[in-house]
Amino acid sequence: DPTSACNLHCTGCWAAEYGNKLNLSFDDMDSIVTQGKELGIYFYMMTGGEPMVRKKDIIELCRKHNDCVFFAYTNGTLVDEALCKQMQEVGNLFLALSVEGEPDVNDMRRGEGVYNKVMHAMDLLKEHGLVFGTSICYTSANYKSVTSEDFIQMLVDKGCRYALYFHYMPVGNAASVDLLLNPEQRIYVKNRVR
């Protein structure tokens, strides 16, 4: 991961435990990709922290290694017009924006106003013709809403081409075990996203 730094402080996120201390230099990231290519690896996933805190370096990495594909999980709040134009230019960076359902449920864990920022980021990415998707953390509070036809249709309408679902794990910043799913809720999600 390029960094442990993040511009948000989401409830239950492990990244908050690391603060802003862990950062790979551009040279380290470049070396990882160079070594990976020697092994035949041309697809790289980035998490964080928030990878877009390092968007300048990530774009440069994409530019330098234009024979590779880079995929980043992002909270979406740092996606702007300039980044979209740079993504068009390099053509090998794809994002999965985190969203967890309706605005109130999403912002309960991620912070006030984050849902609207993510929706704006999706609009920008779509306007620029970029391929992007979403990363959905499902909990006992949102598992039905994030698997509903209406929610999925909203994502399609926004321009999402893929959705990655993963279940909540209570680690990190003010983690709540109340958000864990019981076995029946997990089965419900499995049957909905098949």
Feature-to-residue mapping (PLM):
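Canonical Radical SAM [4Fe-4S] cluster-binding loop centered on the CxxxCxxC motif
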Residues: 1-27
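Flexible loop/turn segments at secondary-structure boundaries
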Residues: 2, 53, 172-173
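Short glycine-enriched, charge-decorated loop/helix-capping segments at active-site entrances
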Residues: 15-23, 108-114, 178-181
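A short, flexible beta-alpha/helix-coil linker loop
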Residues: 16-20, 102-104, 170-173
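Radical SAM/AdoMet-radical enzyme domain recognition
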Residues: 29-46, 54-167
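A C-terminal junction/extension of Radical SAM enzymes
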Residues: 168-194
